[in-house]
């Protein structure tokens, strides 16, 4: 029985799941918005939100903890230099999940996961 077991398995073994969320967290922190399946987005929220909370207080120990969880220097630099100060006054809820229909190949529910308060990007229109 799976009583009181939190988290989703997502049909992967534990090391594959850990590597996938490590890569997805780096992508979300780098791009500030990514498109993925809805269950993966919901699980990714559980990985990224503690990282941003960790980045609110810049210390060597916190940087090492963040690096241990992401294994990416650029991600850690952006976390502590940009995202930590940006979310300093916000007590949690750093991400937003927007449903965006179903994938054409297998009808999987898709979603955008983004960081709230991300800077607006001017859209380029084709002329």
Curated annotation (Swiss-Prot):
Record GO terms (molecular function): structural constituent of ribosome
A biological process from GO: translation
Any one cellular-component term (Gene Ontology): cytosolic large ribosomal subunit
Keyword terms, alphabetized: Ribonucleoprotein, Ribosomal protein
InterPro entries attached to this UniProt entry: Ribosomal_bL17 (IPR000456), Ribosomal_bL17_CS (IPR047859), Ribosomal_bL17_sf (IPR036373)
Keyword Ribonucleoprotein: yes
Matches recorded under Pfam families: Ribosomal_L17
Domain of life: Bacteria
Membrane recorded as keyword: no
PANTHER family found in the cross-reference section: LARGE RIBOSOMAL SUBUNIT PROTEIN BL17M, RIBOSOMAL PROTEIN L17
Homology family: Belongs to the bacterial ribosomal protein bL17 family.
Subunit-level organization: Part of the 50S ribosomal subunit. Contacts protein L32.
Record's protein name: Large ribosomal subunit protein bL17
Originating gene: rplQ
């Amino acid at each position: 029985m799976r009583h009181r077991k939190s988290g989703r398995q997502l049909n992967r073994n534990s090391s594959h799941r850990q590597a996938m969320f490590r890569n997805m967290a780096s992508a979300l922190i780098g791009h500030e918005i990514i498109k993925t399946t809805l269950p993966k987005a919901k699980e990714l929220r559980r990985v990224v939100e503690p990282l941003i909370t960790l980045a609110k207080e810049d210390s060597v120990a916190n940087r090492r903890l963040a690096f241990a969880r992401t294994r990416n220097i650029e991600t850690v630099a952006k976390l502590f230099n940009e995202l930590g100060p940006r979310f300093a006054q916000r007590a949690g809820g750093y991400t937003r999940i927007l449903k965006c229909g179903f994938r054409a190949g297998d009808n999987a529910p898709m979603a955008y996961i983004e960081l709230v308060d991300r800077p607006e990007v001017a859209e380029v229109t084709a002329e």
